[in-house]
Structure formats: C-alpha cells, structure tokens
Amino acid sequence: LWAIPLAFSLLTSSCSDYLDKLPENTVEVEGIDYTNKSNMYMPVSGVYATARGYLGSWSSYGCIIVRGDDVNKGGSPTDQIEYEYASKFQYDRLTTFWALSGLWGNCYYVVSTSNSALESLENYAKHLTSESDKQLNAQYAAEVRFFRAYAYFQLVNLFGDVPLLLDNQELNVFKNTKEDVKK
C-alpha cells in the first residue's frame, strides 16, 4: 500500500522549469542592458504606472481629500465614521481602518518603485556620453523623485513621523521626524 503514494509522488514530481519563470512584465536585473539608452525611460514609466494605480485608488483618494475642504463625507456623523475621524485628523481612532493602512502600503510601494527606478537611472547615467542624454537622465530622475516626495508628503500628513527610505537596501528601519522627511 505504501508503494502507491510513493509511485504517485514520483510520477507527479518533475524537474521541469515550468515554475521557475519570471512573472509577466518583469525583467531580471542581470538582463538589463544599461548601455541601451532607448530603454532609459522604462523605469520611469514603471513609477508612473505604480503611482497611478496605488496613489490614485479611490480608497487612498478618500483619505487624502476628506481632510481638506474639497469634499465633505456627507451623511450623518456616524455614517462612514472612519472618514469622519479622518476629516477631523483623529487618526488615533483609525488604527484598524483598512483604507488608511492601505494608503500606508500604497505610498511605500511608490517609494520602493521610485528607489528602484533611481538606481536604474544611475546605472544608465554611467554609460551616457552626450550632454543631452545626461540632461534627459537628470529629468527622468527628477520626475521619479517627485513621485517619491509626493508619497512622503501624504505619509507625513497622515501619520506624522515615518521611516525615510532613500534606497531599497535598508534592513533596519526607524521612524524619521516629519522635519527630516520634508528636507
């Protein structure tokens, strides 16, 4: 009887590389040709796509705009109570609000993507020779830094002191003051 499960496990296991494929829309870091300047915009495009998808979501947007005078949450004070607290900056009462914790993760996803893009742009910059290509690289880096700064702007406005990650190599992360983040 023990031979049947053993035979079945041997027949169903395989040495194929079917599961070792890269996810779609990804590139191995080792496979990037940083001498091909026509690909230099790709990491920037990734940041735009990430920012659009993660900072432009309806849940994130609700947490951001309800704090100003752009919109009122409407309804009674107990209707969507989380947005009522957010509009009054009472974030200590929102410790389990899914949209707020989602915004935290979304902002740091933009930060992480931006850090990776800046690292790629630095690698492209090492191989650029013409002044116009160097200026274009600097422009792309500025666009990426804008999105990272915008994500941090939202983070410090919502949470106060937050970890400042300027690269994706940090292992020990600590909170930085709002003032340090805004520099």
What are these regions (language model features)?
Residues K37, Y41, S45, A49-Y54, ...:
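Conserved, well-structured interaction surfaces
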Residues C15-V66:
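Membrane-proximal, proline-rich intrinsically disordered regions
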Residues V29, R67-K73, T78, Y109, ...:
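Primarily recognizes Gram-negative and organellar outer-membrane beta-barrels
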Residues L22, V71-N72, L94:
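Intrinsically disordered, low-complexity regions of eukaryotic proteins
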Residues N25-V29, S130-K134, L166-V173:
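Short linear capping/connector segments at secondary-structure termini
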Residues L1-S13:
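Sec-dependent bacterial lipoprotein signal peptides
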Residues W58-N72, S76, V156, P163:
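Short, solvent-exposed turn/loop segments enriched in Gly/Ser/Thr/Pro and often Arg
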Residues K21-L22, V156-D167:
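Short, well-structured active-site flanking segments
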